[in-house]
Amino acid sequence: MKPRSMTLMMLRRRGAFSGCVPLAVVYLLGAAAAAQQPAASAPAPSAAQAPGRGRGPQPVDSRVQIRMHHFAEMNEDIPYALFVSSKVRKDKRAPMIVTLHGIGGTHTTMMRPNAIDLAEAGGYILLAPMGYNPRGWYGAPAPRGRRGAPPAPNQAPNAAAAIPAPNGAAAVPAAPPNTAAAPPQGRRGALPPGLLNNPNDPPNLRELSEKETLEVIDLVRKEFKVDDHRTYLMGHSMGGAGTLYLAIKYPQRWAAVAALAPAAFTVDREGLGKIPKMPIMLVHGDMDTVVPVTVGRAWAEAMKSVPMKTYQYIEVPGGDHGTVIGSHQAEIFAFFAKHSR
């Protein structure tokens, strides 16, 4: 039986918050096992393999297009994945969802069959950029540290405050807005060497990741008649951090965003004060051992304190870091369908 989710919806709340996110040491694992970026000179396969966490490579849905585009700044060809609903017409504006993978993932990681089914039913274009390489963070500030390093000292206190839940539902414990726990130890070896810090990466990797992501989005916008009032952003882990970062930096691009188990240890939550009208959904499993649930709770508390006009926080009992990707796609698509810019 699918575990029930605890959902918090905050509408037109009053309040204020302040604070910034402290640095944290993090062992990040995306939705998938680590996968390296395809070589620029190699042609994209027609049936790519999406990495699956602990289950080996998983075949990408045949409805997904694997494409390449030329990233002129680095003179490289970078892959991206695209699904276009059969309901999309060239002469009619279509909604688009951009989905960002976690660290070690690829452009195919988030192209899950249930997401494709929902995109087909809703008439969406579903776009998954690479973000230049598997660890670019889409421009978001990357957590400092290395594998095996001890957690940062700014752990969330055990006696955390609680986010009040409406309609008599159980309150969800929350870390204070200025606190985000570092991931627990014990995951040494979970990530291949060089995944977090690769000496071959360019020094401006984060900048390149952000630019390449936006370039692909604009490329698809030019090819199709994308509805700028119904363009959405979602991401998992590193991609969740990228989602929150890009939402704050480019609010004019998105009608709503969703972050799944966001590894947003070093994304400044004060930035939410700049986008109080942006609809945001957060999903986090309470058994996540990669990005602790205290991170999601801290962001939920910050959104309540802004106050955000509309946000939704779903904490999944028994949910781990990877399962939240597929388990709440329907809720995310339903949330997006309610909002336009």
Give the positions of each predicted feature.
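N-terminal secretory signal peptides that target proteins for export/translocation
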Residues: 1-14
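Bacterial N-terminal signal peptides
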Residues: 18-31
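A domain-start/cap signature at the N-terminus of enzymes
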Residues: 36-96, 155, 165-166, 175-183, ...
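Serine-hydrolase catalytic machinery in alpha/beta-hydrolase-like enzymes
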Residues: 73-81, 87, 91-225
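Loop/turn elements at helix/coil->beta-strand transitions in domains of secreted/extracellular proteins
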Residues: 93-96, 122-126, 227-230, 252-256, ...
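Primarily recognizes the serine-hydrolase "nucleophile elbow" in alpha/beta-hydrolase
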Residues: 110, 221-223, 229-276
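C-terminal catalytic histidine-bearing segment of alpha/beta-hydrolase fold enzymes
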Residues: 281-283, 289, 293-341
